[in-house]
């Protein structure tokens, strides 16, 4: 297969993994687009994206326009004369003129099995909804949000032990493999594009810190899914004794209870059992303010009086 001249567009670590795969391949990365440097850390120092750092380290020209809607930026991109543009978590909208500039157009690697979970947080929403599988879709981009024709799909079972952090790692390994397969198929003309079924489409809304508050009026199953979805960010939490307590790990208990949602049923080194609207949730790993995450046994050693049976935990619905 003849090497393709590729423009890569991406910003976070997830994107950098894909850029690295392209750099390791026989293709030519002729330019990299990434978002402008942003203030980060306590000193708010301007910081380059992981994609920029990787590109600079490999002596690849880097472009950081604030927008691709203006003609000078579009002309600059066209002058690269690329065969294809690969887009992974770039964060900027590509207007139609840009989508049509490379010879083979623009393709995107998306962290879900489209058309399910279009949008910003597909990995987290798959866990949040209790999906049994996820995967990666490589699509030909159009002007819609993750609406383009699908070129290649891979699947991955979601394990009970998975969190957003672990799924992210799995998809960050799966995505680059799918990307290289798709590029080979495009170059050889052997890929058949598949339209997305709009009837099956839904959107993965961005996560918010407010959404991470545990609502004991939900079922234990739903709360278990949310804790996994919101790990490592924004991290599920509840308010108790005037403190915000983060929850990193839970499981659905086999215990049954008729107690009001938010009531502590039992507290031992095996876990703190809390009644919900449907079932009992066992808290296994938590984080007190200013402390690191700890197993419940250590939490009870430090603050056992906070979690006595029959204590009612704060609930936003109270």
UniProtKB/Swiss-Prot annotation:
One of its GO terms (molecular function) is methionyl-tRNA formyltransferase activity. The keyword Transferase applies. PROSITE patterns: GART (PS00373). InterPro entries: Fmt, Formyl_trans_C, Formyl_trans_C_sf, Formyl_transf_N, Formyl_transf_N_sf, Formyl_transferase-like_C_sf, GART_AS, Met-tRNA-FMT_C. Keywords: Protein biosynthesis, Transferase. It is an enzyme of class 2 (transferase). It comes from the Bacteria. Gene3D superfamilies: Formyl transferase, C-terminal domain (3.10.25.10), Formyl transferase, N-terminal domain (3.40.50.170). Its EC number is 2.1.2.9. It catalyses: L-methionyl-tRNA(fMet) + (6R)-10-formyltetrahydrofolate = N-formyl-L-methionyl-tRNA(fMet) + (6S)-5,6,7,8-tetrahydrofolate + H(+). GO terms for cellular component: cytosol. Coiled coil: none annotated. The keyword Transmembrane helix does not apply. (6S)-5,6,7,8-tetrahydrofolate binds at residues 112-115. Attaches a formyl group to the free amino group of methionyl-tRNA(fMet). The formyl group appears to play a dual role in the initiator identity of N-formylmethionyl-tRNA by promoting its recognition by IF2 and preventing the misappropriation of this tRNA by the elongation apparatus. Belongs to the Fmt family. This is Methionyl-tRNA formyltransferase. It comes from Shewanella baltica (strain OS185).
């Amino acid at each position: 297969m003849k090497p393709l001249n590729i423009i890569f567009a991406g910003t976070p670590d997830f994107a950098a993994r894909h850029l690295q795969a392209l750099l390791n391949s026989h293709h030519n990365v002729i330019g990299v687009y990434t978002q402008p440097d942003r203030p980060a850390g306590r000193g708010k120092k301007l910081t380059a994206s992981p994609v920029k750092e990787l590109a600079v380290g490999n002596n690849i020209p880097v472009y950081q326009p604030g927008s691709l809607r203006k003609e000078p930026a579009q002309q600059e991109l066209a002058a690269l004369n690329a065969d294809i543009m690969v887009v992974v978590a770039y964060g900027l909208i590509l207007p139609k003129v840009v989508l049509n500039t490379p010879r083979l157009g623009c393709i995107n690697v998306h962290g879900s099995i489209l058309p399910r979970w279009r949008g910003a947080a597909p990995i987290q929403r798959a866990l949040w909804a209790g999906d049994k599988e996820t995967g990666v879709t490589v699509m030909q981009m159009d002007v819609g949000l993750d609406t383009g024709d699908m070129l290649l799909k891979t699947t991955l079972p979601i394990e009970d032990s998975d969190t957003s952090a672990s799924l992210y790692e799995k998809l960050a390994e799966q995505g680059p493999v799918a990307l290289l397969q798709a590029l080979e198929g495009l170059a050889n003309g052997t890929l058949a594009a598949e339209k997305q079924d709009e009837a099956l489409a839904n959107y993965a809304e961005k996560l918010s810190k407010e959404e991470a508050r545990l609502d004991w009026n939900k079922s234990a199953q739903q709360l278990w899914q949310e804790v996994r979805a919101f790990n490592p960010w924004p991290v599920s939490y509840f308010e108790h004794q005037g403190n915000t307590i983060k929850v990193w790990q839970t499981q659905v208990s086999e215990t049954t209870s008729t107690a009001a949602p938010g009531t502590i049923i039992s507290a031992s080194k095996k876990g703190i059992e809390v009644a919900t609207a449907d079932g009992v949730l066992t808290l296994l790993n938590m984080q007190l303010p200013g402390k690191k995450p700890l197993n419940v046994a250590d939490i009870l050693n430090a603050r056992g009086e906070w979690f006595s049976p029959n204590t009612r935990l704060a609930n936003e619905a109270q």
